[in-house]
């Protein structure tokens, strides 16, 4: 696994963070060292797939990156005639997802599309995964995407929504940000790396509160919405149609 050193030296003109070739190459290392609880979420996505995916249906992984959630779901699906569609708008990510997924044999077909998730039709879905993806969409586009997902889910279908959160209590928000930075330093990132990546993400990742997510999901129509996992200011929610 290639080590993430992208922000380890001073960058004179620090642009916005993008999921380019450099990020795609080191992404597994970057996400494990940057997102507390990531491996737990990936494992649980497989458990949820085993429980919720039904025969003759589709599973969507929107913002699939290198395919970790797709693979976790596929390993655990027991039903027949299921197809998984993974989507990522980064060509380097989509290419690596194809390579990664095709390295493992399975009877369950996986199609990886390089496209904007807002362009994708959601049809006959028993499960949709948004694993740290919605936060990169413009805030004004989020409800429309969730409405499309809701319409495309079959009754009893599941949405898994993992995100970085902000907290309305400023003291708590600052504490959890600091704990996250401590987590990153404990995983070998320097102060320079932490600060440069934070600056690069500032304009491209707009995060919501847990309550904002819950209210929006309920307003879209989901019958059951709950936070099932949280570590510091990162977490994952489930919404059942």
Swiss-Prot record:
Biological processes annotated in GO: tRNA wobble uridine modification
GO molecular function list: carboxyl- or carbamoyltransferase activity; S-adenosyl-L-methionine binding
Keywords, sorted A to Z: S-adenosyl-L-methionine, Transferase
Positions of S-adenosyl-L-methionine binding: 38, 63-65, 88-89, 116-117, 131, 198
Catalytic activity: prephenate + S-adenosyl-L-methionine = carboxy-S-adenosyl-L-methionine + 3-phenylpyruvate + H2O
Enzyme Commission code: 2.1.3.-
Organism domain of life: Bacteria
InterPro entries listed in its UniProt record: CmoA (IPR005271), Methyltransf_25 (IPR041698), SAM-dependent_MTases_sf (IPR029063)
Keyword Hydrolase attributed: no
Enzyme class: transferase
Pfam family membership, one: Methyltransf_25
NCBIfam families: carboxy-S-adenosyl-L-methionine synthase CmoA, PRK15451.1
Purpose: Catalyzes the conversion of S-adenosyl-L-methionine (SAM) to carboxy-S-adenosyl-L-methionine (Cx-SAM).
Description of how the protein assembles with itself and partners: Homodimer.
Family stated for the protein in its record: Belongs to the class I-like SAM-binding methyltransferase superfamily. Cx-SAM synthase family.
UniProt-recorded name of the protein: Carboxy-S-adenosyl-L-methionine synthase
Organism lineage string: Bacteria, Pseudomonadati, Pseudomonadota, Gammaproteobacteria, Pasteurellales
């Amino acid at each position: 696994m290639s080590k993430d050193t992208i922000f380890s030296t001073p960058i004179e003109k620090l642009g916005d963070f993008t999921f380019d070739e450099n990020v795609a190459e080191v992404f597994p290392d970057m996400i494990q060292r940057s997102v507390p609880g990531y491996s737990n979420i990936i494992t649980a996505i497989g458990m949820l797939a085993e429980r919720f995916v039904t025969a003759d249906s589709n599973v969507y992984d929107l913002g699939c990156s290198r395919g970790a959630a797709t693979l976790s779901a596929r390993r655990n699906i027991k039903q027949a005639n299921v197809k998984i569609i993974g989507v990522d708008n980064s060509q380097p990510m989509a290419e690596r997802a194809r390579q990664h997924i095709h390295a493992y044999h399975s009877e369950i077909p996986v199609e990886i599309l390089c496209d904007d998730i807002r362009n994708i039709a959601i049809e006959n879905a028993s499960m949709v995964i948004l694993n740290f993806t919605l936060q990169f969409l413009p805030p004004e586009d989020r409800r429309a995407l969730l409405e499309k997902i809701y319409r495309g889910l079959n009754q009893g279908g599941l949405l898994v929504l993992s995100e970085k959160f902000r907290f309305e209590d400023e003291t708590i928000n600052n504490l959890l940000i600091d704990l996250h930075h401590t987590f990153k330093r404990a995983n070998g990132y320097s102060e320079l790396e932490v600060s440069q990546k934070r600056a690069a993400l500032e304009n491209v990742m707009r995060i919501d509160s847990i309550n904002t997510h819950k209210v929006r999901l309920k307003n879209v129509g989901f019958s059951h919405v709950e936070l099932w996992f949280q570590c510091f200011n990162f977490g994952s929610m489930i919404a059942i149609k």
